[in-house]
UniProtKB/Swiss-Prot annotation:
Protein name as annotated: Single-strand DNA endonuclease ASTE1
Location of region: Interaction with SHLD2: 349-398
Function, as annotated: Structure-specific DNA endonuclease that specifically cleaves single-stranded DNA and 3' overhang DNA. Contributes to the control of DNA double-strand break repair choice by antagonizing BRCA1-dependent homologous recombination (HR) and promoting non-homologous end-joining (NHEJ). Recruited to the single-stranded DNA ends by SHLD2 and cleaves the 3' exposed DNA ends, therefore inhibiting DNA end resection (necessary for HR) and promoting DNA end protection (necessary for NHEJ).
EC number(s) stated in the UniProt entry for this protein: 3.1.-.-
Length: 672
């Protein structure tokens, strides 16, 4: 992200380029992408098991509470889809490769930073709950952030080195030195502030021979940023013989370029000297590319202040594409993800790698049919209305590219959109379809009958529908304990609500509290823990992929089913730990009987999903001639399993959640 080596350089010499700041009583423009990555990777969160989203949400909430205490008014700006010019494609693919290696390292017990799949959606849900103002730019947000900060004359918070290039009136605060966990008070007052450090562009230019600020965009593209990666620039670097700094070789390129550029009065003179060192046949193309890339550091025409004040988002790049107004509005409000705009504009999407089994096909394969329906809805526009009505769209118009993991590398695969029935409404009117019609489209995509969800609470209808889809897929290798662990995890939100509901103490609340605390203890940190069970990890990565695409389709259809609270829905540490314990224990009925409401809800969830599960999910691992032999075998296995002792020390309250009645259901279904 940003200019190679620049952020490390300015922070290594922070005493030269940064000034101390006591941040309070101000607006603050926050680079949302930088923030949620920083909070995810620097808060000691478990990253191996697909996301402890509740703990991440707690960190996000505490961050913004620190701002509120200091009377700092945050405005979060999120990146949107890829730029229509696709000039960052090489950079994006390089990052995707790096994430694959990091995910592989985590899966084998090593280190690495990989954001859990739904971290961005969780971040947005927390912003909404805390009523933090936010906007999603149509593409990369840096210029929009700079323009808004200068309009409001307030600082920017980010970790992107591009903000060292922008001429920001009130400076740029680096997340690395933003001490939001260490609030201080103004002397002799009770007024809080956040100790921070602000990058001084004036000090930076003064350090390099009082160089002209206007030269910095040229420095950025010569040094190598996300937009420019020309091998021919290495020819220029070698020919100009950049001076070797006394600071050493680590920052040779950064220091050499800055010192070299500082001898020129303006960008035109410097650019001419750059081009002179290149072969004549390359000069015009290189000049055009460099000038175009330097434009990325100029003011944005988008006025985010109008969005925050009046709800109006106008982006000429987006408008010129002829996208429906409701789609543009939903993208700006974060009600549609960048995945949708990438598919709409570029006909290409990135499928982000998770900590999964790298020896198996990537976990997103399971949700491809859902994506094909999403692509079909996006194709369903006025320009193709007649062809769609006759089901005569040529195959090239149905083609979308997906950048996905293949083994430990990336590959672009072609996927064809699902041609929808001729009575489907076009994209511009999709949001106007009756609720029942939109709900039917969603459930048909997930291959679930509406009647199955009738007994399910509204906040769990979408996750249960997704779980039914997941169980039906031949890609999934789910076992009974995987399903049980997921459903148990879904009990945490209603349990938490019971425990924290106002009113006098009652036996029900006491039981709910005991069950909730039991689940909390199960998900206690396991570090330094065992290596990831790759088969279990892969199964849950597949489920999360189904959930992600189910969420996106639900959003595209204007949420015919309520969006679930992702904070409480899935906790990777909990479900992985449950999967370790469940096969080694014997019965859950006594545990769930502590809270009759939780037991009843669990039964509803299980009954809804079991009708879509393959019959082998419920078969015992080894056939036995009698129930007595089965019980003996179970006891014997418990005696040799260290983890089982944990459950039995708790009066045998936890187990595989498969009471005898479920075996009877299986037998009945086989008879039918």
């Amino acid at each position: 992200m940003g200019i190679r080596g620049l952020m490390s350089f300015v922070e290594d010499y922070s005493n030269e380029f940064f000034v101390d700041l006591k941040l309070r009583n101000t607006k603050l423009i926050i680079d949302g992408y930088s923030l949620f990555h920083r909070l995810c990777f620097n808060s000691d969160l478990e990253l191996r098991y697909g996301g402890d989203y509740d703990l991440f949400a707690d960190v996000v909430q505490k961050f913004f509470e620190s701002l509120f205490v200091c009377h700092i008014c945050p405005y979060v700006v999120l990146d949107g889809g890829c730029d229509i010019s696709d000039k960052k494609l090489t950079t994006l693919k390089d990052r995707a490769k790096e994430k694959i290696q990091a995910a592989r390292s985590l899966s084998l017990g090593g280190g690495g930073n990989v954001c859990p799949l739904l971290i961005r959606e969780v971040f947005i849900q927390v912003l909404i709950r805390l009523e933090v103002c936010f906007v999603q730019s149509f593409s990369e947000a840096d210029r929009d952030i700079m323009t808004l900060a200068n309009h409001w004359n307030c600082p920017v918070l980010s970790s992107d080195s591009d903000f060292c290039i922008f001429d920001l009136r009130s400076g740029f605060c680096s997340l690395n030195s933003f001490q939001w966990r260490n609030l201080n008070t103004i002397k002799d007052t009770q007024d809080y502030y956040i100790p921070a450090r602000s990058f001084s562009l004036n000090a930076f230019c003064h350090y390099f021979n009082n160089m002209n600020k206007a030269l910095l965009p040229l420095f950025a593209v010569l040094c190598g940023n996300d937009h420019v990666n020309l091998p021919i620039m290495d020819t220029f670097i070698s020919k100009v013989r950049l001076p070797l700094s006394s600071k050493g070789r680590r920052y040779h390129r950064v220091l050499g370029l800055l010192n070299w550029l500082s001898h020129f009065d303006d960008p035109t003179e410097a650019l001419d000297n750059v081009l002179k060192s290149l072969p004549k046949k390359s000069r015009e193309n290189v000049k055009e590319l460099l000038c175009c890339s330097m434009e990325e550091y100029q003011q944005s025409p988008v006025k985010l202040q109008d969005f925050f004040q009046y709800g109006s988002y106008v982006c000429t790049d987006a408008s010129d594409l002829g996208l429906p107004e409701w789609v543009l509005g939903a993208l700006a409000k974060g009600q549609l993800p960048p995945f949708i705009s990438d598919a709409l504009v570029l006909r290409r999407t990135f499928l982000h790698t998770q900590v999964e089994n790298m020896q198996r096909p990537n976990a997103h394969r399971i949700s491809q049919p859902i994506r094909q329906i999403i692509y079909g809805l996006l194709l369903n526009g006025p320009s193709h209305a007649e062809d769609i009505a006759q089901n005569t769209l040529p195959s090239q118009l149905l083609a979308f590219n997906e950048v996905e993991r293949i083994d430990t590398n990336i590959k672009t695969s072609t996927v064809y959109a699902k041609q929808l029935l001729k009575d489907q409404c076009d994209l511009s009117k999709l949001a106007e379809l009756p609720l029942a019609r939109r709900q039917m489209l969603l459930l048909e995509a997930l291959k679930v009958k509406q009647v199955v969800l009738e007994s399910i609470p509204t906040f769990l209808k979408l996750p249960i529908a997704v779980t039914c889809y997941w169980l039906q897929s031949t890609e999934a290798k789910a076992k009974l304990h995987h399903l049980q662990a997921l459903l148990l995890g879904m009990l945490r939100e209603p349990l938490h609500a019971i425990v924290n509901s106002p009113g006098t103490e009652d036996p029900q609340r006491g039981g709910a509290k005991m069950l909730y605390e039991e689940l909390c203890q199960v998900k206690a940190p396991m570090r330094p823990g065992p290596r990831v069970d790759l088969d279990t990890a892969h199964v849950f990565c597949q489920w999360q992929s189904c959930l992600q695409m189910g969420l996106y389709l639900n959003q595209l259809l204007s949420t015919p089913l309520p969006e679930p609270n992702l904070t409480w829905l899935y906790n990777g540490s909990l479900v992985h730990r449950l999967c370790q314990q469940l096969p080694a224990s014997s019965s859950v009925e006594s545990l769930l009987s502590l809270c009759p409401e939780a037991k009843q809800l669990y039964e509803h969830l299980f009954n809804a999903t079991k009708s879509y599960a393959p019959a082998e999910l419920f078969l015992p691992k080894t056939k036995s001639k009698s129930k007595k032999k089965r019980q003996k075998k179970k006891v014997a296995s418990l005696g040799t399993t260290a983890d089982a002792k944990h459950w039995y020390d708790r009066s045998n309250r936890f187990g595989p959640l498969m009471p005898e009645s479920l075996e009877e259901h299986v037998e009945n279904s086989e008879l039918e």
